[in-house]
Amino acid sequence: MSPKILPGTPAPLGATSGPHGTNFAVSSAGEQVTLCLFDADGAEERLVLPERDGDVWHGLVPGVEPGQLYGFRVDGPYDPAGGLRYNPAKLLLDPYARAIEGQVRFGPELLGHATDNPSAPSPLDSADHMPRGVVLASAPAPTASRPQHALADSIIYEVHLRGFTAAHPDVPPQLRGTYAGLAHEAALNHLVRLGVTAVELLPVHQNVPEEFLIRRGLTNYWGYNTIGFFAPHAGYSAAARA
């Protein structure tokens, strides 16, 4: 076992920062899972997760703090006919990542199979073409209480987060189309005047536009191409824009 990684725990899944480092846990039926840590220059350090409970691989890395970029590589059989496409040349996102940084750069590097032979694994490394998960500090428990509206009295307003405040004259320009814009007093007052009791947001998970849209200079405005269900879409962050 590498001295840089300890057994850790199988729960919770994802990256969990604590006083002794960060615990990484991911579910995979593969033969080996490798944690990939990236520095600010993109240099990669690989650590094999040392423990497995059922199909959950896990390890605790001392010294890893919030802000660390990471991903996984998984070894196993490459048998497309049997539904198995393990390929350690491909960097994988943590499905439980709570933040994702970077963009998908479409190209042959993202293909799991060789470009000239779909039955053979691709040897091209995909790390430079993939976004990475971001280790976050544990968030404090919410203190605000929710309104106790009866279901029969509820008025649910479905809204696209960016579109709702993109042109609102009373929301500051730097906040329009962001989470902070939706939470701005002017936006909330507008909802209250309408009699709305609950807001249902269209997709706010981290998403990417499809390749054919990018080729046409377009984007997936609605966000229905999620790559991380636990990571808020960074493009809606006012802080990320600043």
Feature roles, as predicted:
Residues 20-24:
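Structural beta-strand segments of beta-rich domains
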Residues 27-33, 64:
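Short proline/glycine-enriched turn/loop motifs at strand-loop junctions of beta-rich domains
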Residues 26, 72, 159, 191, ...:
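Conserved, mostly hydrophobic/aromatic
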Residues 171-181, 211-242:
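Aromatic- and acidic-residue-enriched carbohydrate-binding clefts of CAZyme catalytic domains
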Residues 162-199:
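A conserved hydrophobic secondary-structure block that centers on an alpha-helix together
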Residues 1-19, 44, 52-56, 63-158, ...:
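The feature marks proteins involved in alpha-glucan
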